[in-house]
């Protein structure tokens, strides 16, 4: 190779090395600058805040009314990028709000934020006078009003408590979570977490900044309360907020512990469903240790198990009529307190009494005899057909309580007590409502339904939870005959306090004895439907530690019916 050729190769080699070096330096600069831009972009995003307490869809009634009672409240919002003397101005803001300045400084380091507490008129006036740049009073959507409805059903939110739950949330859906996020812990908030959780704010405020995080002159503060989040949905229930409100007002005035369920007659749709004692969902934001609160606060009494007492006699009456074992004028004997194996509540006894009178007067000895005639197998068959072994509620996947076992009716020495709704017989208020609905609906059993579907922001249902087809569990003729007998309960029997002028009612009382209650106290039931002809509402009232179904629950049934008819 000639010397001149070697020289050219050497020059070419070093030019190539130099070029590669320049490329590497440029790539490093790009990477470094990219990091800076990424950081600035992050800062840019940090100049926006969500003007909603929780980025979640709503849980609504059948008409789209929020059950949580959400509302807008003024909150102090701070945009640090607009503060021209951040240290002094944050200290001045802390003095006005009577809060910790260091805490405000720490929040400001993270970007824009709002202070989630009520704003007094005097404080608002001071803020207006101070005219701090970057400090604004903005309406923030609060999820819970002063009187949220159906809290045991809607459930509550809580922060992700553990890495285990965080991993589960991340792996079971398409939504992204951070440790410390607020998520559904119970009820519909829990069951529909993935559908309710939003991915972006529907209501927000922000300051436009460029890629380097500098304020863009001109637009100033921007507020949008109509943004669209396509990934958050609303849970649409079958609840009627008007009926639910009536039920809860009556309960708050009269029921310390118990449940009320209202169903649209001839369907399985639940119009109202409430339990007491109750709570306000914001308690979980205010109490540091939830374990210190009584467990009973959070039990959904409407889906909990209780002995039904004489309400269970409806099952025996339906079975006996359907099987042709009795007619309305079949006679029974009642010896009162001397009757065995189960005494009658009427100490002197009903003596010789017809089946019609026995149901109207809720005669225990008559139904014990009827239970023995039917036998455990047939009682179990009809109780199951009428829904007393099904805890399913469409759209509300509560776990099954395995203590409910109708087979126990066939156990030794159980048949007599079971015939009057004691012993091993356990039911939920929702099941009792569905039982009475099967009579009101001409012998058709409808599965209870609480959720009708999921809707988007426009109110359009994007997913439906259809009602199940009804099942004919007794003949229409039997349902008509039994309905007439239940009407008689409110005309001449122990349920007369459920009757109201001008509207005929059908129903049944129940008084279940519970170990541990004071003398004379029982779980008091009244379950019925109204009007007797062409029913519209089926209602169950349970008052724990009441005086008796006819004395305690029946008058509350009447009050709820009266008020429901007024708002139609």
What are these regions (language model features)?
Residues 1-257, 279-282:
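Extracytoplasmic/periplasmic proteins that interact with beta-lactams or build/remodel peptidoglycan
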Residues 31, 97, 157, 443, ...:
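Conserved NTP-handling cores and scaffolds of large molecular machines
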Residues 259-262:
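Short beta-strand scaffold segments in enzyme catalytic cores
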Residues 96-97, 111, 130-131, 199, ...:
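Alpha-helix boundary/capping residues
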């Amino acid at each position: 190779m000639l010397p001149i050729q070697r020289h050219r190769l050497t020059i070419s080699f070093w030019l190539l090395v130099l070029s590669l070096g320049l490329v590497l330096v440029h790539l490093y600069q790009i990477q470094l600058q990219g990091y800076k831009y990424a950081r600035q972009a992050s800062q840019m995003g940090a100049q926006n805040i969500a003007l909603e307490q929780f980025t979640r869809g709503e849980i609504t009634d059948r008409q789209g009314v929020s059950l949580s009672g959400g509302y807008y409240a003024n909150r102090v919002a701070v945009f640090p990028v607009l503060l021209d003397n951040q240290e002094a101005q944050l200290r001045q803001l802390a003095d006005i709000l009577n809060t910790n300045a260091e805490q405000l400084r720490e929040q400001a380091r993270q970007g824009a934020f709002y202070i989630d507490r009520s704003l007094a008129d005097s404080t608002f006036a001071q803020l207006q006078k101070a005219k701090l740049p970057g400090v604004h009073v903005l309406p923030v959507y609060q999820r819970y009003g002063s009187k949220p409805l159906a809290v045991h059903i809607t459930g509550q939110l809580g922060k992700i408590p553990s890495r285990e739950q965080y991993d589960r949330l991340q792996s079971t859906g398409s939504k992204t979570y951070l440790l410390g996020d607020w998520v559904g812990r119970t009820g519909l908030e829990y069951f529909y977490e993935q559908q309710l959780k939003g991915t972006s704010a529907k209501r927000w405020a922000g300051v436009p900044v460029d890629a380097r995080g500098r304020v863009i002159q001109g637009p100033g503060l921007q507020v949008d309360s109509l943004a669209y989040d396509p990934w958050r949905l609303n849970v649409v229930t079958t609840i009627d907020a008007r009926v639910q409100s009536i039920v809860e007002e009556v309960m708050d005035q009269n029921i310390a512990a118990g449940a009320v369920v209202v169903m649209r007659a001839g369907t399985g749709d639940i119009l109202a469903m409430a339990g007491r004692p109750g709570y306000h969902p914001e308690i979980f934001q205010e109490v540091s240790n939830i374990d210190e609160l009584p467990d009973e606060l959070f039990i959904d009494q409407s889906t909990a198990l209780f002995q039904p007492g004489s309400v269970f006699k409806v099952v025996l009456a339906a079975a006996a009529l359907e099987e042709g074992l009795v007619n309305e004028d079949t006679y029974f004997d009642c010896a009162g307190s001397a009757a065995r194996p189960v005494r009658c509540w009427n100490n002197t006894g009903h003596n010789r009494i017809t089946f019609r009178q026995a149901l109207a007067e809720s005669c225990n000895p008559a139904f014990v005899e009827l239970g023995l005639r039917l036998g455990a197998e047939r009682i179990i068959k009809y109780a199951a057909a009428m829904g007393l072994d099904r805890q399913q509620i469409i759209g509300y996947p509560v776990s099954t309580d395995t203590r409910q076992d109708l087979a126990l009716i066939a156990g030794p020495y159980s048949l007599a007590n079971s015939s009057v709704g004691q012993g091993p017989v356990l039911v939920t208020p929702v099941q009792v409502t569905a039982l009475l609905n099967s009579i009101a609906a001409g012998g058709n059993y409808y599965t209870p339904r609480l959720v009708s579907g999921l809707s988007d922001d426009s109110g359009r249902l994007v997913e439906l939870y259809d009602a199940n087809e009804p099942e004919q569990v007794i003949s229409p003729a039997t349902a008509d005959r039994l309905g007439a007998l239940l009407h008689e309960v409110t005309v001449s029997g122990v349920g007369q306090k459920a009757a109201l002028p001008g509207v005929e009612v059908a129903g049944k009382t129940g008084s279940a004895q519970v170990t541990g209650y004071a003398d004379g106290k029982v779980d008091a039931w009244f379950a019925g439907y109204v009007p007797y002809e062409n029913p519209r509402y089926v209602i169950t009232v349970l008052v724990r530690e009441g005086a008796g179904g006819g004395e305690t629950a029946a008058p509350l049934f009447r009050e709820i019916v009266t008020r429901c008819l007024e708002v139609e």
